[in-house]
Amino acid sequence: LEAMENVTFRARMMGAGVYDHGYVIGYERVNDHQPGAPGPRHRLWRIRAGHVVTATGAIERPLSFAGNDIPGVMLASAIRDYAVNYGVSIGDRTVVVTNNDDAYLTAICLKNMGLDVPAILDARNSGGGELAEAAKALGIRVETGKAIAKVIGGKRVTGVGVCAQAGQGAVLEEIDCDAVAMSGGWSPVVHLWSHCGGKLVWDDVYSHFKPDVHNPPKGDHGEAFVSAAGCAAGSQTETDFEGLSLHETFRTATESAHAAVKALGRKPIEVSVPTVQEHDH
């Protein structure tokens, strides 16, 4: 992208707002990462766009249970990111609690890095698919239809009380651990889509709001001037895997690129969606 003459690529920059007539505010952090360097710290961009693509991703939802604010309780994706990107372990013995498949990747990742994962507590009566089988093959205990009744500990996690997902929350057993990775699923980041008038629709399958493709933000002539791509579009998967999907990301990105090119009066080049392997352990 940096080598293309018709592309302006800016890292460390976010879309702060999308307004009427394709008016976009961009907020660039120029020197926040090197405070002593000369020049401006921040820069505000004012952009007029013929079409806008929001590829803002998704945010992981937490789960509600007693003690979910005790230090050592974190989102499953955050624990995985610390381990993979920075080599930082949040705990030596992590219990994973989830209602979707994606958190299984965290358990598998931690186990492969030599850390202990005593149990995965899945709120669903069945789920996990091939990821659950991979976790079991690594010696991880998988409990379906289970949840956390409470986290044991004060200033840090020392264990969890396990309960049935359906019931009164009575503790069935306690598991010693020093970290909890929780995942309540994923929700598209729809702030910019909604900011400029785009409507949302409820998705019963994934229990989240997502952009309504039939009611996008529209310009003064009634034309759609914003499209969403990837997880931001709410298109997560076409398979039995209940989580984030690279295939769907590529597919919706291609569709959004075509929409942008057509909006500018150009003819899009036909490209095939790359073949990807999901569930990279």
Residue ranges of model-derived segments:
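Residues forming the flavin
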Residues: L1-H281
